[in-house]
Design a protein with these regions (language model features):
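N-terminal Sec-pathway targeting helices
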Residues: 1-12
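Serine/threonine-biased, Pro/acidic-interspersed low-complexity stretches characteristic
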Residues: 4, 21-28
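Hydrophobic alpha-helical membrane-insertion segments, chiefly the h-region
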Residues: 13-23
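Protease-labile, long low-complexity intrinsically disordered regions enriched in Pro/Ser/Thr
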Residues: 25-174
Length: 174
């Protein structure tokens, strides 16, 4: 019987939603598919800085700056955020979100759900609606995570954000 552990965290802070998901790869915690959506009340020019305990793997779009720190890694993006969630970089390219994944220290979750392969999509649709994700965010989340959950007969899924909030934080400046 194939089993997997997937920790999926969802944090909603004011008008921001940050999806962080992680799983164990070779017994090493890996943050997978964290996506930051920004929804300001009015268009804003922002510098978004990720302060990470760990090392970045994939980042998109490329940050304007990235450096090693005593803690791990720091990456910053300079974007214009629109109320509809569109992010525009200094070159004028647009993006729906900021994405990164990383190797970082994460504890195993204390609570969650055991999801059967055949229930992956309906489970995610229900939980993401309860968490307040909009259709675009939910579709992005489900199209990434449903195949990974369905790859195993049963998967343990947790939405416990406390598993990663100390290892990764965002700072926003005008």
């Amino acid at each position: 019987m194939k089993k997997a552990l997937i920790v999926i965290g969802v944090v909603v802070v004011a008008a921001l939603a940050c999806f962080v998901a992680c799983n164990m790869v070779n017994n090493e915690p890996v943050a997978k598919k964290p996506v930051l959506y920004l929804y300001p009340q009015e268009e804003r020019h922002l510098t978004v800085t990720l302060d990470l305990e760990g090392s970045l793997d994939t980042v998109y779009p490329a940050p304007d700056s990235q450096q090693a720190t005593e803690r791990g890694t720091q990456a910053s993006w300079m974007v214009t955020a629109a109320p509809d969630g569109t992010l525009t970089d200094r070159a004028g390219r647009t993006y729906p979100s900021l994405f990164w994944d990383a190797y970082m220290p994460l504890p195993e979750p204390d609570s969650g759900f055991v999801v059967a392969r055949e229930d992956a999509v309906s489970f995610l649709e229900g939980k993401l609606a309860q968490l307040g994700l909009n259709d675009r965010e939910a579709a992005d989340f489900i199209t990434y995570w449903a195949p990974r959950i369905r790859a195993h007969e049963y998967t343990f899924v947790s939405f416990d954000a406390s598993a990663y909030t100390q290892a990764a934080s965002y700072h926003f400046t005008d």
